[in-house]
Regions:
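Short aromatic/hydrophobic "clamp" motif used to bind/position activated sugar donors
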Residues: 87
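Amphipathic, non-transmembrane alpha-helical secondary structure
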Residues: 17-24, 76, 80, 102
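Conserved donor NDP-sugar-binding/catalytic core segment of glycosyltransferases
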Residues: 99-118
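Catalytic metal- and UDP-sugar-binding loop of GT-A-like glycosyltransferases, i.e.
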Residues: 64, 90
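Glycine-rich, basic loop-to-helix element that forms the pyrophosphate-binding segment
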Residues: 65-82, 99
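Acidic donor-binding segment of Leloir-type glycosyltransferases
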Residues: 20-63
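N-proximal low-complexity "stem/linker" segments adjacent to membrane-targeting elements
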Residues: 1-25
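Acidic metal-phosphate-binding loop of nucleotide-sugar-dependent transferases
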Residues: 93-95
Length: 118
């Protein structure tokens, strides 16, 4: 199963850095990470570019112009870029437990949509 991890963000590069660090050490690395960016400034773009240099899977940056809070639209933009059979959405301030992606893969069932909260 090919897994796409979509991480939403907006001008919180330090939180995104921690989230990406947790993605990098997963026991099951996602096949791609897509950053759903709702118009962050250049420092977020630089952070993503630096992480992409030695990340264990491709990192894509789905940026949209900042026109106010448009989280759903930014997630949809990222979803259009995804190649995974299974999509995991998280917010950019989530630090994943190291088995987070592996647990999703193990528990995935065709035809189901699962949502959770903190």
């Amino acid at each position: 199963m090919k897994i796409s991890l979509i991480i939403s963000t907006y001008n919180r590069p330090e939180a995104l850095r921690l989230s990406l660090m947790s993605a990098k050490v997963q026991t099951r690395i996602p096949d791609e990470v897509i950053i759903a960016d709702d118009g962050s400034k250049e420092n977020t773009r630089e952070l993503i570019k630096n992480f992409a240099k030695d990340f264990p899977c491709p990192i894509l940056h789905a940026w949209q112009e900042d026109k106010g809070f448009r989280l759903a639209e930014s997630r949809n933009n990222a979803l259009r870029m995804a190649h995974g059979d299974y999509i995991v959405f998280i917010d950019g301030d989530i630090i994943m437990e190291r088995h987070f992606i592996a647990d999703h893969e193990r528990l995935a069932e065709k035809g189901y949509f699962v949502i959770g909260s903190r």
